[in-house]
């Protein structure tokens, strides 16, 4: 099995593309969902965030106040690095747990929905393939203005706060162009899924895993045969 990192930009259509992959039966892990899960009350990351930033980052119900925490690390590289040092290991741990579940279920590849895949670069080394859901800037701007009921200035400000889609597209292995009709985008997704399914890149890991299991089974057999006492089949000195 191998990992496919998928990203996009605001109003590029990434969520719709993810839905098509899921309809095709693909395994999808949303890293944003994991990031929210690992900071829930009672989780190690939640406790460490409170220790590092104080109780002012908590809501009345004990949840992390994401806006307050965001304000605390805004333009504060040291604080941002501290927060990342708390959350990123937990995110990777949960990500690997979810990935292993899909591995055991026989999936050939798993899609990781990672909004900041190229910005943070932390997870890139785990990805066999990277996919960007792209659309041209004019289309992105028009969609965002309509979807969020924004004026042009506010919509442009939101787009400009992200790494440009054209830059992400240059860094990706695969680009799904969502600038035109949705039917064309959907066909691109179907073709990419077929290509990834045909890939043999999942075999080395699966063969290695099966080889490891065979080795463990052989070791257990030898230990059972040579180290445990043999059962008594009868008493040679007894009379019939």
Curated annotation (Swiss-Prot):
Example of a GO biological process term: coenzyme A biosynthetic process
Recorded GO MF terms: ATP binding; dephospho-CoA kinase activity
Positions annotated to bind ATP: 8-15
Domain DPCK: 3-207
Keyword ATP-binding attributed: yes
Source domain of life: Eukaryota
Key words of the record: ATP-binding, Nucleotide-binding
Similarity-based family: Belongs to the CoaE family.
Name of the protein described by the UniProt record: Dephospho-CoA kinase domain-containing protein
The species this protein was found in: Rattus norvegicus (Rat)
């Amino acid at each position: 099995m191998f990992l496919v990192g998928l990203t996009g930009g605001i109003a590029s259509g990434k969520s719709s593309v993810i839905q098509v992959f899921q309809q095709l039966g693909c395994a999808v892990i949303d890293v944003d969902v994991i990031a929210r899960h690992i900071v829930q009350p009672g989780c190690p990351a939640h406790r460490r965030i409170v220790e590092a930033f104080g109780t002012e980052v908590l809501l009345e119900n004990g949840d992390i106040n994401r806006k307050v925490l965001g304000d605390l690390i805004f333009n504060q590289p040291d604080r941002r690095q501290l927060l990342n040092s708390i959350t990123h290991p937990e995110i990777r741990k949960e990500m690997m747990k979810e990935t292993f579940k899909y591995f055991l279920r026989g999936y050939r590849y798993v899609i990781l929905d990672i909004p900041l895949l190229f910005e943070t670069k932390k997870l890139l080394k785990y990805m066999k393939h990277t996919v960007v859901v792209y659309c041209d800037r004019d289309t992105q701007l028009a969609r965002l203005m309509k979807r969020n009921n924004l004026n042009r200035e506010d919509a442009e400000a939101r787009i400009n706060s992200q790494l440009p889609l054209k830059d992400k597209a240059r860094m990706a292995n695969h680009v799904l162009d969502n600038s035109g009709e949705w039917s064309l985008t959907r066909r691109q997704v179907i073709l990419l899924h077929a290509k990834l399914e045909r890939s043999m890149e999942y075999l080395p890991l699966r063969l290695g895993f099966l080889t490891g299991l065979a080795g463990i089974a052989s070791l257990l057999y030898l230990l059972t045969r040579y180290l445990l006492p043999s059962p008594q089949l009868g008493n040679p000195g007894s009379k019939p």
